[in-house]
Amino acid sequence: MRKSPSKSQTKKTSQLRKTAKKSNTFEFGVFDLAIPPNITEPKNLKDVRTKWIPFGNDNLFPQYLAELKRKSSTQRSVLAQKTVFTSGAKFVCRDENLEKFIEDINADHESLRDVFKKLADDYYTFGNAYMECVKYDGGINIYHIDATTVRMAKSKKEIYVNSDWCKYWNNDEKMHRIPIYPRVAHNKFVMHFKDYEPTFNFYGLPDYVAALEHIENGNRSTKEICRRRK
């Protein structure tokens, strides 16, 4: 769950106008809209006290995007359609051995399409996707890593994975590191997928980042309209 907005965050207000049926008077409802501040990355890494790079001022920008996706039916529908169109129905090949592999690519018995769909979902939702590969004698297992749990190391050579960045952001025991390809450690490595974004060296951004305020405003307006109709 995303933390409550800090005092430093800019609060904006939106007004809904309702016209009375039997008069010319207007009724106004006012409520706060807390939009995350401009998303930036640290310019001077010496000022970053952690070994990983925060994503957002409170390091919870991915968590905010995940929550926003759950609150907005339109946003969720658009992202879901893009994911489905990208992942397709299945992967097809003519090699029998390869076909067996793409139908069962990890210890969780997921297919390549299952993992690819999760990666596409994260890519469109967060602007970042992380694929973990685990080598073993005779083959390799491929997994998806939830993008909300990942933060990039300052060295750009590994990632930090934490199940709950709200509680354990400073607890080394609650997070583990995985090297980024081509580095390999303990037969594991990660591949990071993102698009180029000016002034961003560690993370990508989703395409809809410029519309965050509009999405949030739409959610709040819809809730206010529904409340007034009760």
Residue ranges and their predicted role:
Residues 2-74, 79-230:
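Structured, contiguous alpha/beta core segments that scaffold functional sites
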